[in-house]
């Protein structure tokens, strides 16, 4: 049976999943009881780990523990931000086909290469499984959130990640818009409100200004930085500690030691969190590098000084969004803080001062608000009839201007940024030369006057134009943005009716359909491997459990007296051999563990039966859960307490 549609906030550092049921949004906890799950995937010699399990082992396996996939998705390898991030990542990123970044790991002793979409799809699969365990049903339909300032390539790549995870992505929605739903869902009446959502997460930053009235959420403007968040504050703290360690230890530089750096980063992140509630935090690391301990205390003031420039840079998109919306700061009724990094006191102070002392709204959980809104949108799109969400309407905008290159490399804009989507715009263009039989349509996004300064999304040729003097042919170009913010472009020669159509594809390092299909198959294969591994671990545990339980039972003196020392010693030797075998065969197959268990049971069960029949079971017998070890029969002895019939 298929369950309801879910909402997933696919974050840079943590992800969150929610569902709308019984007229309420439920944030779904994972198997550790946590309401957010680390966006981490780790590859070991034996298995693939996702979420908490992956993050918990990163210090001892830094090269094969992948995080920050969201900072790679939809980007090129030579992108400045990718090159900058690579300095901080312990895992290896290489230049792949079409300039697309590849992540290289060692998995089960073999070199493997993954795209960011595949890593993100693994995190999405984990979130899907968390929802399925909670709902007791399989889940297919999903709404996934992305930063409002994500460009076309990043949105499409996120949608591809959902497809690889076996999900039907009903809609990609913007994170601040989703958070606005969480804020405004229960606030009916009270007239029109201008709300500014300030969303500073682990890796991305968005500002959106919305007008909310009677369930209609209309985005007026959006701005942001897809490369600013808590990770950057961690990096600054790590760099400070590296310099401090050098100063204290005659210039010893730990930068090249990935394990030391990863341990330091974990403690820096922890210190950053502590500084949100305390004025100082201690970092203590035993034997950090070459046997040298590292201990330091960071004050909140020092941390704020280190990150001052980054903190202040968050106000630039706020000003930009206000300007684009045509509103001034006095017209904003409510400032809503979203994302874990808004817990930093300095960020809260900066915003409060910017808005002339207005207290930001803290009524929603900054970690969960985005998933909450995504779950509401998922319920609406899947036809949920709940009265509470019936009247809700989302009107979002395109974050960047879209246009094409005309003569001289000029950017001719068809859709201006902050235009409400979905939208469709067309314009007539013509040829630049006499008897020109084809035109190259190059599609760009960005705000600069010349295309060379903007972002090329894709290009295609329209051929077969009837030969004519320059300026005579009429070529109609149509830009169509769907509700996901993804662009389709059509060009048509009006005299011949010949047209070419493109959903912006591979020019920006997009995955082809063949690649997506291959990745879907591989994801299925990894899922099967994970299941196989789980069964192996279970059967290994069952064997060990049985062996230790029997060892305890048979080692008691009274048992040897009852059963005879030879038989008991033989059984104990069999158990010892089995446990030694487990030690040296940790990666054995499920069937091998099962066979070994049957062998040990074959030796021990007759003894257990004999023991119970003689009425001499010590204590309560081996603790094997329900029933007896290996199905040994229950005691049939006449000794012990008797049962009387009740009249």
Curated annotation (Swiss-Prot):
Residue ranges of the region described as Disordered: 615-647
Compositional bias ranges of the Gly residues kind: 616-630
Superkingdom: Eukaryota
PROSITE patterns from the UniProt entry: HSP70_1, HSP70_2, HSP70_3
Record carries keyword Nucleotide-binding: yes
A Pfam family annotated for this UniProt entry: HSP70
Sections of the chain in a coiled coil: none
GO terms of molecular function: ATP binding; ATP-dependent protein folding chaperone
Cited CDD domains: ASKHA_NBD_HSP70_HSPA1
Record keywords: ATP-binding, Nucleotide-binding, Stress response
Family: Belongs to the heat shock protein 70 family.
UniProt-listed PANTHER family: HEAT SHOCK PROTEIN 70KDA
Protein known as: Heat shock 70 kDa protein
